[in-house]
């Protein structure tokens, strides 16, 4: 389950980070003025084909998985270890209670918007 948790974090990174630029600059040929907001899309970095084999697939047994779902280095989220533990416990409890389930319609999964992203509805079928 810990490997699956890391893969879910990579594939469905929950957080976007926004920062205000301090000085005029340019990013990939686009001018950015001082005082403008920049959104750092960690989810797109976690889908980089130069870093991840089959990046658009969820592989719950993915071995190499240095994702940036919680940021990196000294700016990494302080709560990342707690979040991982909570996800692991939740998945373990779910699988114990409902060992046989399936997603009924992947296109019907909806997500919240904003800087913190998460599923709002996930249609599943619990089977015997």
Q: Which residues are covered by each model-predicted region?
A:
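Cytochrome P450
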Residues: 1-128
